[in-house]
Amino acid sequence: MCGLCGFTGEIVDRDAVLENMTEVITHRGPDSKGFYTDDKISMGFRRLSIIDLDNGSQPIYNEDKTLVLMFNGEIYNYKQLRKELHEKGHVFATDTDSEVLVHGFEEWREDLLNRLRGMFGFAIWNRTDESLFIARDFF
């Protein structure tokens, strides 16, 4: 499965530290890597491609790029959730289960967790209010 890492706050050589953290977890995802950094947070990701092999690079954003997602796992009911979110007006750029999480969080906030079926761990950074939501499956 994929791997994610990150830290908050300012540190010396932030980009180098994040790159090193991401390299340490290369065995979790050899197919690609992704990064997100701003003044408050740094997140890294290693991807093992399973679904939507060409379009699943992370981070994943919502439509206006106010929410940033790093995700590890598999959401079994993502097609059902995607359909429901699409009917509510959400616009999807990929066919990934990852993108369902960011739009689901945008729509339902923490209640998203009660709708998910699968195995997962993820972090969502809200750039607007500078809050971090981290969750994992119940098992």
Task: Describe each PLM feature range.
Residues 1-139:
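N-terminus-centric sequence/structural signature that marks the extreme N-terminus
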